């Protein structure tokens, strides 16, 4: 499953050497076309609806709509089915990749707003994070750039800013990925979470994040 945004879309470009991938996602976009044509996406090893690309809707170009039109490999289902965490979990080795606007030092994820300004809905992020966590061999992943606005703002933040909401709670978050590394927060203490997240923040912001963490007794 890939959520909406530049990061999930970019992941598709690096899957060209994989084999026997399957798709169960609320949404699919243009990236699947090339992967199907290369034989990367076959869905043959899926444990739920093998041979089918399962989704609720598509978002992309005319080429994508031509691809799905009368395509027997496409299985469109309502979100009550695709996004049900227990349904998601029936897919063995389910990997859910979703993005975020910011992640605080305790592991809380905000994906829809910056302060009081809303940029989008949060879609099926929580559903797929929980479903992948329940899946045998599954991996729930939050992926984001470490900075925004040309490197002037850290996306690993001391705390979710005022007015913003928590999309995925610290209790649900497992893997967090930036260009500086990968950490697994599941089952970690607040001290461990703060240390791990500071390590994948942009180096320019690590010192101030550490100062905050010490002042607020995270470290």
What are these model-derived regions, one by one?
Residues 1-219:
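Conserved phosphate- and dinucleotide-binding cores of soluble alpha/beta proteins
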């Amino acid at each position: 499953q890939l959520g909406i945004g530049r990061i999930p879309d970019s992941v598709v470009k690096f899957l060209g050497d994989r084999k026997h991938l399957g798709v169960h996602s609320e949404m699919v976009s243009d990236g699947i076309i090339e992967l199907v044509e290369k034989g990367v996406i076959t869905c043959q090893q899926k444990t739920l609806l093998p041979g089918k690309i399962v989704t609720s809707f598509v978002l992309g170009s005319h080429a994508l709509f031509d691809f799905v039109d009368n395509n027997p490999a496409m299985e469109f289902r309502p979100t009550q089915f695709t996004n049900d965490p227990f349904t998601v979990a029936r897919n063995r080795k389910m990997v859910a990749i979703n993005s975020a606007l910011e992640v605080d030092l305790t592991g809380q994820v905000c994906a829809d707003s910056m302060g009081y300004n809303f940029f989008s809905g949060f879609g099926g992020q929580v559903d797929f994070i929980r479903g992948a966590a329940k899946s045998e061999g599954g991996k729930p992943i939050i992926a984001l750039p470490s900075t925004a606005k040309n490197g002037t703002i850290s996306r690993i933040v001391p705390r979710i800013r005022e007015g913003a909401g928590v999309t995925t709670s610290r209790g649900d978050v497992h893997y967090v990925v930036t260009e500086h590394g990968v950490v697994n927060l599941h089952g970690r203490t607040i001290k461990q979470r703060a240390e791990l997240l500071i390590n994948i923040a942009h180096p320019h912001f690590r010192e101030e994040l550490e100062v905050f963490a010490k002042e607020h007794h995270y470290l």
